[in-house]
């Protein structure tokens, strides 16, 4: 009888990536098959996020539902991972004694041993340590699930913004070696992946070891990824302005594989608030980066993160944020009301902005961003956009859907063989969250050519050291 695994994931793209790796790992080691139905599962895993308000209570609310399943099936294994697990540790079991496994973002690779331990002597396991980059050495080979893929290039963050829990839950910055990253991407390209999204809490701080022992920069890595045959688009998230250096901007100037879209969090337009947040940059410095980017790539579109109602934020501070939004002309944003995260410096600040005022500021900010986003979309009306076709449309299974370079979802009529390929689409309608168009050119009509297959690149560039260990040498 097939053993089944159910994973519920909350939070960022890093968590989505981690959950996919958990599924691949437990399939390889235990033969667990994913199920969307928790009642069918032999193992339930909750991959948590501590960024949102009341994150801990949300976890225990979900665990309360799963407790009923465990009462019906005592052999059911329940595990809690992610950032809340890293923060709370053994405290989770004090409130939910039926939880069998507690693991952090850096110990998910040990899940097979944890499950074996629980199956063996029924003793609970808690492992929320930070074992450097070990987890990537223990994960199975990547499996493509469509033409796009996430690839983690680093873990953790050293910035210690006063509102953020990431350095405490994921540890400080650790970069994967470049050959590991490039080999994983080449394997994905061999399976039909055309677009990769490089992940990290602060990707532009990547300083990975190269095959010759030197230390690479993020700009170096972007160019190496762009050189992999079969990879036509590169995205990355998330970045910090303080390390968005000129060499990265130069990659936008000379590397067409890097898309004309950037998510660069700023959080506030007030230097006073930025200082309270520990952001180490000013609004003017942020705008200077954007000016350089648009000089290198005039059509680039920018999204950002904003926190409203941070302790001490005045009406004047908020107006400065609104001015920054207008000056930069952001395309979209992830914007939130401040809520204190336990254990962070901001949690000790006086939360002196009334709740109704926070809500009003958030509404004003989001309305302005939505207006700007719609204006950007209207400029695309009547233009021809190159779309990477990802699959069927969520709105209509008889239609296809894909994304433009600037991250717009486009729905259109097409045929199944277009999935995983590029098509040129004329934009005919504009909606708040998507565009609509008609195909004017298929990939076969574009004259695109792959000079060398990903399989041959892997075979040609694979080397072995004196111990017989293979590595990828560009």
From Swiss-Prot:
GO molecular function, one term: N6-isopentenyladenosine methylthiotransferase activity
Binding site for [4Fe-4S] cluster 2: 157, 161, 164
Cited PROSITE patterns: MTTASE_N (PS51449), MTTASE_RADICAL (PS01278), RADICAL_SAM (PS51918), TRAM (PS50926)
InterPro entries for this protein: Elp3/MiaA/NifB-like_rSAM (IPR006638), Methylthiotransferase (IPR005839), Methylthiotransferase_CS (IPR020612), Methylthiotransferase_N (IPR013848), Methylthiotransferase_N_sf (IPR038135), MiaB_methiolase (IPR006463), rSAM (IPR007197), rSAM_horseshoe (IPR023404)
Keyword Cytoplasm in record: yes
Cofactor(s) required, per the database record: [4Fe-4S] cluster
Residues that coordinate or bind [4Fe-4S] cluster 1: 12, 49, 83
Single Gene Ontology BP annotation: tRNA methylthiolation
Family label: Belongs to the methylthiotransferase family. MiaB subfamily.
Protein name: tRNA-2-methylthio-N(6)-dimethylallyladenosine synthase
Species this chain originates from: Salmonella typhimurium (strain LT2 / SGSC1412 / ATCC 700720)
């Amino acid at each position: 009888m097939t053993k089944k695994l159910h994973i519920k994931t909350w939070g960022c793209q890093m968590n989505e990536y981690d959950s996919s790796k958990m599924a691949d790992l437990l399939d390889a080691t235990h033969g667990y098959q994913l199920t969307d139905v928790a009642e069918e599962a032999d193992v339930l895993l909750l991959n948590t996020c501590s960024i949102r308000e009341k994150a801990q209570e949300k976890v225990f609310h979900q665990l309360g539902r799963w407790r009923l399943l465990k009462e019906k099936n005592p052999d059911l294994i329940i595990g809690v991972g992610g950032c809340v697990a890293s923060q709370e540790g053994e405290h989770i079991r004090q409130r939910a004694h039926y939880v069998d496994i507690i693991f952090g973002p850096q110990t998910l690779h040990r899940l097979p041993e944890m499950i074996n331990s629980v199956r063996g002597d029924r003793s609970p396991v808690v492992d929320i340590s930070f074992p450097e980059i070990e987890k990537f050495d223990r994960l199975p080979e990547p499996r493509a699930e469509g033409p796009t893929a996430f690839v983690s290039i680093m873990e953790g963050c050293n910035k210690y913004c006063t509102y953020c829990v990431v350095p405490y839950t994921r540890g400080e910055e650790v970069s994967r070696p470049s050959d590991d990253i490039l080999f994983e991407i080449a394997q994905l390209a061999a399976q039909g992946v055309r677009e990769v999204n490089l992940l990290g809490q602060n990707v532009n701080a990547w300083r990975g070891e190269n095959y010759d022992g030197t230390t690479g920069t993020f700009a170096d890595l972007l160019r190496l990824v762009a050189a992999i045959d079969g990879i036509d688009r590169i995205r990355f998230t998330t970045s910090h302005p303080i390390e968005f250096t000129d060499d990265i901007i130069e990659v936008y100037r000379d590397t067409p594989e890097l898309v004309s879209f950037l998510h660069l969090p700023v959080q506030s337009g007030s230097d006073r608030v930025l200082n309270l947040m520990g952001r180490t940059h000013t609004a003017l410095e942020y705008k200077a980066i954007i000016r350089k980017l648009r000089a290198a790539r005039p059509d680039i579109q920018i999204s950002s993160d904003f926190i409203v109602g941070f302790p001490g934020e005045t009406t004047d501070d908020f107006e400065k944020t609104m001015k920054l939004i207008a000056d930069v002309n952001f395309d979209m944003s992830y914007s939130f009301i401040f809520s204190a995260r336990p254990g962070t410096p901001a949690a000790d600040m006086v939360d002196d902005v009334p709740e109704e005022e926070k809500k009003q500021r958030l509404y004003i900010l989001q309305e302005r961003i939505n207006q700007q986003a719609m204006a950007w979309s209207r400029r695309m009306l009547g233009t021809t956009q190159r779309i990477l076709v990802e699959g069927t449309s969520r709105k209509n299974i008889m239609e296809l859907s894909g994304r433009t370079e600037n991250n717009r979802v486009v729905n259109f009529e097409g045929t199944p063989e277009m999935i995983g390929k590029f098509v040129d689409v004329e934009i005919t309608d504009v909606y708040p969250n998507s565009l609509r168009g008609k195909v004017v050119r298929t990939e076969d009509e574009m004259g695109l050519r792959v000079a060398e297959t990903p399989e041959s690149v892997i075979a040609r560039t694979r080397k072995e050291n004196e111990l017989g260990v293979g590595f990828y040498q560009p």
